[in-house]
C-alpha cells in the first residue's frame, strides 16, 4: 500500500512548512484546530493596522515550524531528543493557542470568568487525547511543564519561547511595525541546554536583547495602541449591556 503523501504549506514568513507526521496532519484537519482559521491573532488591532487580519491558525503553524528548527539545532549540538519527544513538542506548540475564543484576548475574561485560554487549550488537548487514544499524553505533559526534561516545557512557554518568537515576527510583518522584526533564526541557532535548562550561548546575547526590546516596543506601539484598546473596551461594554 502506497504511503499517504503529507502536505507542504506555504507561509509568507518562513516559506515552505512541512508536515512530517500523520498525527500532526490529523490534528491540523480536526475541527478543533480548523476553527483557529476564524480566530484573529490580534483581536481588533486591524482597526489600527489594516493588514493585521492574520489568524491563530497561521501563528500555530509558524510556531510548529520554528519548534522543528529548534529541535534540529539542539540535536546538532548533541542534545538527545527522541522521535517521540520531537513529535510531542510539535503537538504541544501547535495546540498551545487552541483554547482562544473570538477576538482572541479581548473577550478572554468576559465569556468565562477566571478562566484563561491556557486552561481552555489544555481542555481541548485532553479531549483530543481521548479521541486519539492517548497519543497526546506526552505533549500534554510538556505543555503542563510536568515532563522531567524541563527545557522542553521552556521551549513551549517561557520568557524566550517559540510562541513569542513567531508572534513577534508575524505580527510585525502583518502590521508593518518593523520594531518587531526579530531574527528568529539567529536566536534559535544560539539555543543550548545546560543542567536541563534552556539557555542561549553568550554570542547570542545581543540577539536576545533585541528580542526583549522588540517585544517592549510592539506592546507600546501595537498591542496597547489606544485605538485598539478603546475598541476592545467598547466591545466588552456591548456584551455587558
What is the predicted role of each segment?
Residues 42-44, 48-88:
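Alpha-helical phosphate/pyrophosphate-handling elements in metalloenzyme active cores
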Residues 127-217, 224-227:
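Histidine/acidic-rich helix-loop-helix segments that form or flank divalent-metal centers
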Residues 239-241:
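Conserved small/polar residues in nucleotide/adenosyl-binding loops
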Amino acid at each position: 500500500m502506497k504511503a499517504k503523501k503529507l502536505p507542504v504549506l506555504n507561509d509568507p514568513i518562513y516559506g515552505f512548512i512541512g508536515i512530517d507526521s500523520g498525527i500532526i496532519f490529523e490534528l491540523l484537519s480536526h475541527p478543533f484546530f480548523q476553527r483557529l482559521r476564524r480566530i484573529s491573532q490580534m483581536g481588533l488591532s486591524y482597526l489600527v493596522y489594516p493588514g493585521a487580519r492574520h489568524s491563530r491558525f497561521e501563528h500555530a503553524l509558524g510556531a510548529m515550524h520554528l519548534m522543528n528548527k529548534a529541535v534540529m539545532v539542539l540535536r546538532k549540538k548533541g542534545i538527545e531528543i527522541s522521535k517521540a519527544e520531537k513529535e510531542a513538542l510539535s503537538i504541544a506548540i501547535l495546540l498551545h493557542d487552541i483554547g482562544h475564543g473570538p477576538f482572541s484576548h479581548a473577550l478572554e475574561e468576559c465569556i468565562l470568568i477566571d478562566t484563561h485560554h491556557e486552561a481552555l487549550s489544555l481542555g481541548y488537548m485532553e479531549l483530543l487525547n481521548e479521541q486519539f487514544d492517548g497519543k497526546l499524553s506526552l505533549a500534554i505533559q510538556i505543555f503542563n511543564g510536568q515532563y522531567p526534561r524541563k527545557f522542553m516545557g521552556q521551549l513551549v512557554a517561557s520568557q524566550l519561547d517559540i510562541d513569542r518568537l513567531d508572534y513577534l515576527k508575524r505580527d510585525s510583518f502583518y502590521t508593518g511595525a518593523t520594531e518587531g522584526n526579530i531574527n528568529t533564526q539567529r536566536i534559535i541557532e544560539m539555543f543550548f541546554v545546560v543542567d536541563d535548562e534552556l539557555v542561549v550561548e553568550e554570542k547570542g546575547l545581543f540577539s536576545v536583547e533585541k528580542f526583549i526590546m522588540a517585544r517592549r516596543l510592539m506592546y507600546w506601539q501595537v498591542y496597547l495602541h489606544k485605538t485598539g484598546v478603546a475598541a476592545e473596551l467598547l466591545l466588552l461594554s456591548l456584551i455587558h449591556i
